[in-house]
């Protein structure tokens, strides 16, 4: 039996090792560990739900890891504990994954108030791993009040993370395409906020991208006929490498959370996520039973 009290106990190296073991257990595909993983999850669930879940997506090279490290260090200075779940693509040939995102977060990875866990996608679509949601719950039970999920970063299919986080952020580059290109990306209509990174490299292009993306999101909203709980998705500029715009970004996040909470949409979104997770587990259980009994 896994001692879950270590996870919910005092923070430190012992807790970090317990978190790693718990996530490994939940990710295991071994049949003899399935019951133990379910028991662990059941024990941890009462201690979850108190964090803010932030999904971050964007194409490779957009600067997700750099941005997450700068943001994470900024939040830790404000008294937060930050967990980062990074998803690396798995090879379709060997099935392996480099799991190198953690190496791009040198300062954050050694901070005692941060926990970074790289996981392979293992062929799971939507930009996340099969057990990302469960890993997020483990981090919440351990007392991390901000949990960030960095997706694989393959482009238009990065949608699953939007269904398991409180806010979905899409990162873009200046000169990444006009507003029609933005509309083509199905992930755009799910974004609560678009961040244009590396704005310092070409200020004119960044300004143009901000205007084009904002107009594209307004167009998407008009045709979809939705208003996100008194929140109008927008685009902002940052430079993660220089640390410019990080405070403004977090202010937008806080504003979004306040509006969602006031209108009851925050709780509604969590309920929808729980329902989605339940059906995912039912589906996984049926597939497992079919494999066992042919």
Task: Pin down the residues of each PLM region.
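Short, acidic/small-residue loops that bind anionic groups at enzyme active sites
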Residues: 170-182, 222-225
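Conserved beta-strand segments of the P-loop GTPase G domain that flank and frequently precede/overlap
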Residues: 118-119, 170-173, 195-198, 237
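Hydrophobic positions on the alpha1 helix immediately C-terminal to the Walker A/P-loop
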Residues: 67
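Long, well-ordered amphipathic alpha-helical subdomains in the mid-to-C-terminal portions
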Residues: 18-21, 237-240, 248-294
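Nucleotide-state-sensitive switch-loop elements of NTP-binding domains
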Residues: 2-54, 62, 71-157, 164-170, ...
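P-loop (Walker A) phosphate-binding loop of NTP-binding proteins
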Residues: 59
